[in-house]
Amino acid sequence: MIAKYIIKHGLELAYDIKADAFMIFTETGKSYELLKSFLKKDEHSGIIKILDKISHKNVKIIVATPNQVTYKKISSENEENIYPIFIKHREDNRCMIISSGIVHALKMKILKENNKIVAVVGEPKTPGKLDTIMVVNVKEHVKTITLYELFETLDEKQKRTLKEIIKLAMEIGREGREGEYVGTIFVMGDTLNVMSMSKPLILNPFAGHNASIFDENVKGTIKELSSIDGAFIITDEGKVVSAGRFLEIKGDVNIPKGLGARHLAAASISKNTNAIAVTVSQSGGIVRVFKDGKIVFETDPRANILFFD
């Protein structure tokens, strides 16, 4: 069984590199049972077992699961130095699974910003298929905490749509258009209110079309239109309703110095409606996510492929 050896070598790697924690992800709990087989003491063996090494180095064992039944079972065992974590959402790729586990562990103060961990993970949504060992510096994930907190307030369709928008924004921020950076805004959700607080700058290219943000052809069209003024309006379900919308700015909105009208509009629409706004900066491709008038996440897509790819 490959999973058994992945766990074994992951534990040994955690010891060898002096990691602060070993993190494993499990759906059904079977991987956790395999893990426990390495952590049992053998009083009759003269061999120094992995348990002795891990205990000596004070390596924390973190077991993360999106399954409530599995989480309750692991928690009820109350094993020393084993920290169970419940993850609300099932993620779509290995990097996102690990990021989610780290963010939850940070919020629970199991991990610290300067920690280094070894994570063992497998094919998403496929129980028992552990196949990957990763060494991760926790500080690289600290900035994603507020983004994950936002995700936790969304249902599955909203979360899926927002991820797709951020992915597309990252691509636009990296690639630009015809070798030049372009700036744009995406507004997701609370569509009726958003439309009432905006006005068209161009004829709507998506009128009469059932355009979806998950359609590669539609994403290509959005990239072509990304250099025009105004915002793309997208529903919670991912339907692209309009492009080139001028967003009204209402009330007092505070944004960091150096940000321009595009970011002010994004902050305002996210404050005055229940929408989430995502911007791409024309000055450098920086991607920012706005909610309730505040920046909850920002990243440079040229430096970070991020966990959505």
UniProtKB/Swiss-Prot annotation:
Cofactor: Mn(2+)
Any matching Pfam family: DAC
GO terms for MF: adenylate cyclase activity; ATP binding; diadenylate cyclase activity; manganese ion binding
Top-level lineage group: Archaea
Function noted in UniProt: Diadenylate cyclase that catalyzes the condensation of 2 ATP molecules into cyclic di-AMP (c-di-AMP). c-di-AMP is a second messenger for intracellular signal transduction involved in the control of important regulatory processes such as osmoregulation.
Family from the record: Belongs to the adenylate cyclase family. DacZ subfamily.
HAMAP family assigned: DacZ (MF_00840)
Protein name per its UniProtKB record: Diadenylate cyclase
Organism: Methanocaldococcus jannaschii (strain ATCC 43067 / DSM 2661 / JAL-1 / JCM 10045 / NBRC 100440)
Organism ancestry: Archaea, Methanobacteriati, Methanobacteriota, Methanomada group, Methanococci
Gene: dacZ
